[in-house]
Amino acid sequence: MCPEQPHDTRAERDEMSEQTQQAAQPAETAAYDVRAIQDKWLPVWERLDPFRADDSSPREKKYALTMFPYPSGDLHMGHAEVTALHDVVARYWWQRGYEVLNPMGWDSFGLPAENAAIRNDEHPATYTYANIETQYESFKRYAVSFDWSRRLHTSDPEYYRWTQWLFLKFRERGLAYRKSSPVNWCPNDQTVLANEQVVDGRCERCGAEVTKRELTQWYFKITDYAQELLDRLDDLEPTWPARVVTAQRNWIGRSEGAHVDFVVDGRDEPITVYTTRPDTIFGTTFMVVAVDSPLAAELVTDAQRPAFEAYREEIRKETEIERLSTDRPKTGVDLGVTATNPVTGTQIPVWATDYVLADYGTGAVMGVPGGDQRDWEFATEMGLDIVRTTQTPEGFDGEAYHGEGPAINSPAPGADAPLDINGLPVDEAKRATIEFLEQQGTGAGAVNFRLRDWLLSRQRYWGVPIPIIHCDACGEVAVPYDQLPLELPELRGADLKPKGVSPLAAAEEWVNVACPECGGAATRDSDTMDTFVDSSWYFLRYCSPDYTEGPFDVEKAKAWMPADIYVGGVEHAVLHLLYARFFTKVLRDMGMLEVDEPFAAQLNQGIVINQGKKMSKSLGNGVSLGDQLAEFGVDAVRVTLVFAGPPEDDIDWADVSPAGALRFLQRAWRLSGDVTSEAGTPAAGGDVALRRVTARTVHDAAELIESYRFNVMVARVMELVNATRKAIDGAPGPADPAVREATETVAILLSLVAPYVAEEMWERLGHEPTVARVGWPEVDPALLVEEQVTAVVQIQGKVRARLEVAPDISEADLEQLAMADPAVVRAIDGRPVRKVIVRAPKLVNVVV
């Protein structure tokens, strides 16, 4: 299946709109009790349990995965959309004869539960598990084909035992480590944030302005896998949404350039900077160092220290977004030292500034004002030299120029330098400069990544405790594996209020322990893990949720993985999806997985909006899923969401009609009561025209589902309902076997989007439940061969006649037939024919 399919054409949308109107017109009044049908079939499905995946089944396996929800309140319209779309695929695979794993669980650690516990003076588990049960009952009523035997919650100790186990295994491989560094700090939630959780300088969760704080934190070394994470995106490109692949490529941010060593007065070790344009080194007229970096504090002279410290305090009050703003004046302080340009040998000043960040490389950047706009502005502000090293295009009237062109001033005319790259294009100039640096031992070619290691420590309570003990004598000591899970102590209400350190730090009985190695006094690590750690492997636990010997049964994971489709929002493109890919690769290298990627294909749904805007309480445009289900029923809401448009498009609830969907379902349901032939009657002797419509619908539905054009699939079912109603009310009548075949096909196809009405139809047609597992309708290939097609005859571009012809008619015969048609003869009206263009069997174009 491939998500990258073209959207429906305007003609298709118009056709679908027409079909909706036709299918929604009831031919008669009939009793159709939505609530009674739902109440009838839900307990039957619970008893039959038709969607329990059998690990030992000999059938080919499919893994249908949707992103598990956070348990905050009941399900909303977004949940309804994603699960309705996802369920089309899962139910389709069951009908096609696959053994399908379609599990569900809850991402149940996180801040909302902790904040609710503070407000309500309770334990976070109270809020969490109450909401889980509410959502669980709603999912069941919504009739999603989940295998509930595999249900999991990431906040259960039997789950997070294995999250802790994985952390320790990563640590043993050098992939989990602790360091002190400036981190993103949310002053509202009083916790650190990973780079990916900062959007435009603000906390993605609460919107507070993010500040920097120096803390010792735990990290996952995701950068060890940066190149592979990037390279394997090529494999995912055919089956993942293009915008997700692009977002991950940009986030990983691979660039090729060079490390260049600058010797600084009074310092034994050179300062190494990374640049993507080593060819511009002749234009390096200064060096800038992040003002809040340890390097700046080390380099500053005593004479400049007062000015430096005052400037540093001023900058510490600024947010990262303010520091990186392109429209603010550049500021800085001369550190009073110079560095030596390794190519020209000239001395250049070293400045501290706010527009370089401490966590970028070494925190130092070579200033090339002729090729970088920020450097240009800084040099202009501080009165520093500006030297262009790349020839600008004719007519260029800008400031810094970073584009292509021959090297100039490299070296400057008359200058004596050991390297001359003047006249070389950029790529050749870069190579020549790197070769020189490597020969001189003052630099080397290098690859750099924008991706930074994953900061996973959080200073909150409701998360996975980090299984590390700190001992003055032994250092960091892992909690022994046989003592996992390390469970959270019982804290509630005011005990959880943010204090800048984790609430666990105040749980003295829990935090103070004996060192497992020496037996001396020690303390537990009081931070908890980022909840994205929990969700980076949950899809593997689904393969064997009750397994007690490891995080998952390796053999069962081998049978089910990778997930064949993963459905969820695009907002997780560079967070959850990147982290899950990282975990999969580490587990593969540990010998626990055989796959390189966790998700073979991915589908991103749009969002449900209302009146052209995202739903919000402040705008008063919210739509309650519960109200919609109560008024129109589950099936009508599901059909509305699936039929609204391509899955990746947003749905404006003001523009769709659950009432129209309900009328369509009533019309489909009536068919099952009007069929008079017995169940099991062979269809072979039935009306051929209707059988052709049925066969074509089944054939098209399969292709449309596999290309994620679910909305068009629903339109085809609407067409079949109309054709069947016409056959019942006219010829060949309700007793014709083709009418039964068509109606049974409607029920099977509707089981993918409207399971309640489909089950009711199936029973009324004389069958036992469940229609969801009867199998895909078989199609006689002969019925797909058209007996006649319509050929259009145009004269001067205007349609003058339509002819019913055989699909294999020759161009000569079609031309002869068209030219003899009375309407064509009248339209030509004796004028000489200049040209006849024939495209058999569909078109004849006459030019007079």
From Swiss-Prot:
Segments of this protein annotated with the region Disordered: 1-30
An example Gene Ontology CC term for this record: cytosol
Broad EC category: ligase
Stretches with biased composition (Basic and acidic residues): 1-16
Gene Ontology process terms (BP): leucyl-tRNA aminoacylation
Motif ('KMSKS' region): 614-618
Reaction(s) the record says it catalyses: tRNA(Leu) + L-leucine + ATP = L-leucyl-tRNA(Leu) + AMP + diphosphate
Binding site for ATP: 617
Keyword Coiled coil: no
Record EC number: 6.1.1.4
Compositionally biased residues, Low complexity: 18-30
Protein family (similarity comment): Belongs to the class-I aminoacyl-tRNA synthetase family.
Name assigned to this protein: Leucine--tRNA ligase
Gene: leuS
